[in-house]
Regions:
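Short, surface-exposed, charged amphipathic helix/loop patches that serve as local interaction elements
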Residues: 2-6, 14-16, 21-89
């Protein structure tokens, strides 16, 4: 179930509107679980753990079409703050 204290994110996938609540713990858990040869399962779990319960069945329809990494990528991009980081040498 989605962490109610996180950032609310709405994704439109095809004609479906899905609602997610992404918190820092879910974001970090997904990144920490990813390896060079294991990206799909953490992406799937991240999406399923952050989606609103009412949208879970619809999300499963899209995840079953191989979109786990795409959906997780959009959620992660939207969750992160938009900042410019520069390095001074």
């Amino acid at each position: 179930m989605a962490d109610e204290s996180g950032k609310k994110i709405e994704l439109t996938i095809g004609d479906d509107i899905l609602h997610f609540t992404v918190g820092l713990a879910a974001y970090n858990n997904c990144l920490n679980a990813m390896t060079e040869s294991n990206k799909v399962a953490p992406s799937f779990n991240f999406a399923m753990s952050t989606v609103h319960p009412d949208d879970k069945e619809t999300l499963t329809k899209w995840l079953d079409q191989g979109l786990a990494t795409d959906i997780a990528g959009h959620l992660m991009t939207e969750f992160r703050p938009k900042v410019q980081i520069t390095v001074k040498a």
